[in-house]
Amino acid sequence: MDGVTPTLSTIRGRTLESSTLHVTPRSLDRNKDQITNIFSGFAGLLAILLVVAVFCILWNWNKRKKRQVPYLRVTVMPLLTLPQTRQRAKNIYDILPWRQEDLGRHESRSMRIFSTESLLSRNSESPEHVPSQAGNAFQEHTAHIHATEYAVGIYDNAMVPQMCGNLTPSAHCINVRASRDCASISSEDSHDYVNVPTAEEIAETLASTKSPSRNLFVLPSTQKLEFTEERDEGCGDAGDCTSLYSPGAEDSDSLSNGEGSSQISNDYVNMTGLDLSAIQERQLWVAFQCCRDYENVPAADPSGSQQQAEKDVPSSNIGHVEDKTDDPGTHVQCVKRTFLASGDYADFQPFTQSEDSQMKHREEMSNEDSSDYENVLTAKLGGRDSEQGPGTQLLPDE
């Protein structure tokens, strides 16, 4: 039994050894396959990482290409030994308030515009700049005087002595009417001057009207007239109203001529309005300041007609003219003159050049028939006798 037992154990050992010898090469092959698989996996991962890294690098390079910086960035600190650059000088005008200067400029411009607008509004409101119609050669401008004081002066270049006087007419309203043709450049600009008709024109109009019931004065060209008017209760009466019409040229070419009015009449009436609200119960006072002393002497009979004229003058329409001059040779006299009656209405209508011949003919006929007065110089200057004045005027008899 003992011999049989070892034999069985030996047999089992041999079988085990043979089995181990057969198992070892297979396991080695399997280990090799696993190692190769692991290595290939790592190699694949590394390849993928390399591809991703290359892609990122290319993408960043394209980005930098698109974002090119125009200047070179300084990465190195500047040396302290180098001199510093000089600072820029400050502009002192930057401190000034620019808005205030602009406002100042705008204010100056606005002031200019305001003055221009005031002139334009003044010209537009005035009746001088109203366009006249084509058919009307004359344009009348009426100035109604109510409760105001007007200083009216006739100016001339001649420097001569003057005398003062007061006349008291009973008229309460005065309408001064002037044609547009006779208006001068100064009247178109300032509207302060009104042309007064000359003595010859008034004489022609008086001869044409042939009204013996009117007493009118012919103003010389070298007189200074001052009107002082205050409101009266009876000013609304149409009968107590005096109107003056200034005749002008017929053709409309005189408007373009600036000196047309001065050739027709050199007398300008300056009217300056002053409010008089406190005084309302006075009458109109007219002061005539003449350059020389004139006395109304009849042309035919100096003694008879003068006395008759002095008798016909009413007490309410007589003004005493007193001469006050510094010249010792000038004679002082009181001259009585008649003015418009309270019921008379003086009307001077403008006439044209076509009627000049008829006016002159009528004037000659009326001068021969009626007893007109002539102004004769009575003052004796330098030992001379009484001579007739240079501007002999005609006054129609009442």
Swiss-Prot record:
Residues 59-398 are cytoplasmic. Pfam families: LAX (PF15681). GO terms for cellular component: cytosol; Golgi apparatus; membrane; plasma membrane. Its main location: membrane. The keyword Translocase does not apply. GO terms for biological process: adaptive immune response; antigen receptor-mediated signaling pathway; B cell activation; immune response; intracellular signal transduction; lymphocyte activation; negative regulation of MAPK cascade; negative regulation of T cell activation. Expressed in spleen, thymus, and peripheral blood leukocytes. Expressed in several B-, T-, NK and monocyte cell lines. GO terms for molecular function: protein kinase binding; SH2 domain binding. Residues 303-318 have a biased composition (Polar residues). The chain crosses the membrane at residues 38-58. Keywords: Adaptive immunity, Cell membrane, Immunity, Membrane, Phosphoprotein, Signal-anchor, Transmembrane, Transmembrane helix. Induction: Up-regulated in T-cells following TCR engagement. It is found in: Cell membrane. The modification Phosphotyrosine is found at Y193, Y268, Y294, Y345, Y373. Phosphorylated on tyrosines by Syk, Lck or ZAP70 upon TCR or BCR activation; which leads to the recruitment of GRB2, PIK3R1 and GRAP2. It is a single-pass type III membrane protein. Residues 1-37 are extracellular. Residues 320-329 have a biased composition (Basic and acidic residues). Residues 228-261, 298-330, 347-398 are annotated as: Disordered. Negatively regulates TCR (T-cell antigen receptor)-mediated signaling in T-cells and BCR (B-cell antigen receptor)-mediated signaling in B-cells. When phosphorylated, interacts with GRB2, PIK3R1 and GRAP2. This is Lymphocyte transmembrane adapter 1. It comes from Homo sapiens.
